From Swiss-Prot:
<dbReference type="Pfam" id="PF00707">
    <property type="entry name" value="IF3_C"/>
</dbReference>
<dbReference type="InterPro" id="IPR001288">
    <property type="entry name" value="Translation_initiation_fac_3"/>
</dbReference>
<keyword id="KW-0648">Protein biosynthesis</keyword>
<dbReference type="GO" id="GO:0016020">
    <property type="term" value="C:membrane"/>
</dbReference>
<comment type="similarity">
    <text>Belongs to the IF-3 family.</text>
</comment>
<keyword id="KW-0934">Plastid</keyword>
<comment type="function">
    <text>IF-3 binds to the 30S ribosomal subunit and shifts the equilibrium between 70S ribosomes and their 50S and 30S subunits in favor of the free subunits, thus enhancing the availability of 30S subunits on which protein synthesis initiation begins.</text>
</comment>
<protein>
    <recommendedName>
        <fullName>Translation initiation factor IF-3, chloroplastic</fullName>
    </recommendedName>
</protein>
<dbReference type="GO" id="GO:0009507">
    <property type="term" value="C:chloroplast"/>
</dbReference>
<comment type="subunit">
    <text>Monomer.</text>
</comment>
<dbReference type="InterPro" id="IPR019815">
    <property type="entry name" value="Translation_initiation_fac_3_C"/>
</dbReference>
<keyword id="KW-0396">Initiation factor</keyword>
<dbReference type="GO" id="GO:0032790">
    <property type="term" value="P:ribosome disassembly"/>
</dbReference>
<keyword id="KW-0150">Chloroplast</keyword>
<dbReference type="InterPro" id="IPR036787">
    <property type="entry name" value="T_IF-3_N_sf"/>
</dbReference>
<dbReference type="Pfam" id="PF05198">
    <property type="entry name" value="IF3_N"/>
</dbReference>
<dbReference type="InterPro" id="IPR019814">
    <property type="entry name" value="Translation_initiation_fac_3_N"/>
</dbReference>
Length: 185
């Protein structure tokens, strides 16, 4: 039980939560720990009832008339919410987008080097953005650039899938690859 302090969330959505004595409404609708409505009570009576139950009175909805408060162990509730948020962050994809740059006139050995780079990035679980740059009048040879990116896609098709097929953005052609999810069978 957290004796009437004004607790602040780190979230920008909720700047603060009112609990116990900090609830400034004359009467509130009280909801039990199990979700059962206890009815409309005077705020002081509701705080007293919460203390007798060993829980906190937390303002849930101040917009409704009368405002809705819930009886919960706020410390435990806050811990569970923070734990869920932390687990959610763990599950988020930490995949970075790695970039491999080349031109359409790339030599065979250099192409193999870029292919190996992309292969390593994909193996480590990162997305790969392949950027093909054209300088000056080279933009007239878009078909050669498309052929090169198609060749790269076929060379990496065993471990990568195309997230975005080759597209032109100004004087560059871009291809985005993501690692294939391998079934553990």
């Amino acid at each position: 039980m957290l004796g009437g302090e004004l607790l602040k969330y780190k979230s920008s959505k909720e700047s603060h939560i009112l609990i116990n004595e900090n609830i400034n409404f004359p009467c509130v609708r009280v909801v039990d720990v199990t979700g059962k409505q206890l009815g409309i009570l005077d705020t002081r009576q509701a705080v007293e009832y919460a203390k007798n139950q060993g829980v906190d009175l937390v303002l849930v909805n101040e917009i409704s008339d009368p405002p809705v408060c819930k009886l919960i162990d706020y410390g435990k509730h806050k811990f569970i919410v923070e734990k869920r948020v932390k687990e959610g962050r763990k599950k988020q994809s930490g995949a970075l987008v790695k970039e491999v740059k080349m031109t359409y006139k790339i030599n065979e050995h250099d192409y193999e080097t870029r292919l190996n780079q992309a292969f390593k990035f994909l193996k480590s679980g990162n997305k790969v953005k392949v950027t093909l740059t054209f300088k000056g009048r080279e933009i007239q040879h878009l078909s050669l650039g498309t052929m090169l990116l198609n060749r790269l896609m076929t060379d990496l098709q065993q471990i990568a899938e195309v997230k975005r097929s080759p597209y032109q953005d100004g004087k560059t052609m871009i291809l985005i690859l993501t690692p294939k999810i391998v079934d553990p069978q």
